[in-house]
Amino acid sequence: MKCYLVVVVAALCTLVAQGSVGAPIPKPNPIEDIYASQLPDPGTTAQMAAGDSAYPLTLLASFDPNDTSALH
C-alpha cells in the first residue's frame, strides 16, 4: 500500500510540475499602446515655488550626522 502511495504522489507531483511549466505567460502590451492621453498632465503636477526652498535648506543646515542625543 505504501508503494502505491509513493507512485500516486510522484505522479501528482509530475502533473503539477508540468502544469506550472506549461502555463502560458501573459504578453504585456507594447509601448505603442500607451497613448499621450494616459500620461500625467505636466500642468497638474505640484511645483515648488522658488521661495519654498528655504525650509529644506534650513533643515539640511541643522542636520548633524554625529548627533547621538536621541539615543540616550
Swiss-Prot record:
Disulfide bonds: none
Signal peptide, first to last residue: 1-22
Compartment(s) of residence: Secreted; Secreted, Cell wall
Glycosylation sites: 66
Alphabetically ordered keywords of this record: Cell wall, Glycoprotein, Secreted, Signal, Virulence
Summary of subunit composition and partner proteins: Interacts at the cell wall with secreted rep1 repellent peptides.
Protein family (similarity comment): Belongs to the lep1 family.
Cited function: Core effector contributing to spore formation and tumor formation at the host plant. Modulates surface hydrophobicity promoting cell-cell or cell-surface contacts. Lep1 and rep1 interact in aerial hyphae to form a strong hydrophobic layer. Plays a crucial role in hyphal aggregation that might be a prerequisite for strong proliferation of diploid cells and for induction of the morphological changes associated with spore formation.
Protein name as it appears in the record: Late effector protein 1
Natural source organism: Sporisorium reilianum (strain SRZ2) (Maize head smut fungus)
Gene: lep1
